[in-house]
Regions:
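Extended, charged catalytic domains and RNA/DNA-binding interfaces, predominantly
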Residues: 1-191
Length: 191
């Protein structure tokens, strides 16, 4: 193992959203902004919510339509456009890009996939556990985030945590806040 003095520090963003699904701003602008200040990025579309609640509640129809409409756009050409642009911006040794996407889950908590292969397919799943099973044997991290969200409402369910090659880390800090402690300097925002 190299000594600490031989190691280099790299800066990146492994979970950046844009308007390809339901984030803000143009996808190309997201890559350009990252390229101007970071060493690596994964612009991350929202891909699925297998256990989306509220199907029987007419008051939540707009929420369901908002999410499922974005997932449909991703599957109807958006993902191919996303993969192509991710490959376009990847410059080995200069600026690295990763194909990734996010899945929501009420039961397991939200997760983000981060793929080594730049042509990684969008994996359909019925749950986070199903996703992890289908991803076995592939070079992909499936990492939990929103650590500070409430359990049962997309907050991480630690009973589902599996250490190993698929989940070598968890997201502790994002624009939602610092999830290390409920006493952190930056309170958690659930928007």
């Amino acid at each position: 193992m190299p000594s600490a003095s031989d190691l280099k520090m790299y800066w990146g963003d492994l979970h950046n959203h844009c308007n390809i699904t339901y984030g803000h701003g143009d996808m190309r602008d997201a890559f350009e902004a990252a390229k101007g200040q970071l060493d690596f990025v994964s612009v991350t579309p929202h891909a699925m919510w297998p256990d989306i609640p509220g199907a029987d509640d007419p008051r939540l129809k707009w929420v369901i339509d908002y999410h499922t409409g974005a997932f449909k756009r991703l599957r109807e050409g958006g993902y191919e456009k996303y993969v192509a642009m991710t490959n376009e911006y990847n410059k080995e040794g200069e600026f690295l890009t990763f194909v990734g996407y996010e899945a929501h889950s009420m039961e397991h908590g939200d997760h983000v996939a981060l793929n080594y292969d730049l042509d990684a397919p969008l994996v359909e799943c019925t749950s986070i556990e199903d996703w992890k099973q289908k991803a076995k044997g592939h070079k992909v991290f499936i990492t939990p985030h929103h650590m500070g969200y409430q359990g049962g409402y997309r907050g991480y369910n630690w009973k589902c945590f599996t250490e190993g090659d698929q989940t070598p880390f968890v997201e502790m800090y994002s624009r939602h806040g610092l999830a290390e402690s409920d006493q952190g300097d930056y309170p958690y925002l659930h928007d």
